Regions:
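An N-terminal assembly and electron-transfer interface module characteristic of large anaerobic redox
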Residues: 1-200
Length: 200
């Protein structure tokens, strides 16, 4: 560092330590906020939506305002990192050999959403990403085997036409509301949640 950037090594070490602390603080606050959202929707009898996606989908120009389509209707939106326990899910019964953290978080969210009454799952994909093809199938399989929830998969492209996406979101919300109403009518908050068996 000193030779290349004229920065002392001890200064770099201190800066790195501060950055690690800041990152840890941010992650703790994000998890805390996620727990608060879950508590609020539980008390209100509602639900939140977890949008499982890749980092570039945080850009409104890429996601075309999808999170806002839920929040405008009073449905809170969580990112995978804000879902309590997302780093502690046992994925040994997944059919996929997990090769990166993004895949792990999406699959972990599927397991958590399937077993949490106050959560629903939306997966965003772009540009026909090859990995998303089998991730989508595995997310649907895992959630289907564990319970009655069906995730929404929405493929985004370069078009900014909002109409079709709005229709998809409204249809998804209506399906979720109908399923939840049927479950309440049966006297249960959710259908039975089954453990994920060994797929082989």
């Amino acid at each position: 560092c000193k030779e290349t950037f004229d920065i002392d090594a001890d200064l770099v070490a201190k800066a790195t330590e501060q950055a690690d602390r800041a990152q840890e603080t941010f992650e703790n606050q994000l998890q805390l906020r996620g727990r608060q959202v879950l508590e609020n929707v539980h008390e209100d009898g509602g639900y939140a939506v977890v949008i499982a996606s890749r980092p570039y989908h945080n850009d409104p120009l890429v996601n075309h305002g999808l999170p806002k389509l839920f929040s405008e209707r009073g449905i809170p939106v969580l990112t995978p990192d804000a879902v309590p326990g997302v780093c502690n899910v046992d994925l040994s019964n997944s059919r996929i050999d997990i090769v990166n953290n993004y895949h792990a978080r999406m699959l972990s969210c599927a397991v958590i959403v399937a077993s949490t009454p106050e959560l629903e799952l939306v997966q965003m994909g772009s540009f026909g990403c090859g990995h998303d093809a089998y991730l989508t199938d595995e997310i649907a399989r895992m959630m289907g085997e564990m319970g009655s929830k069906v995730p929404m998969m929405i493929k985004l492209d370069e078009s900014d036409v909002a109409g079709p996406m709005g229709i998809r979101v409204r249809s998804f919300i209506e399906s979720v509301n109908r399923r939840r109403a049927e479950e309440r009518a049966e006297g249960a908050r959710v259908h039975a949640v089954h453990p994920l068996d060994d797929p082989y």
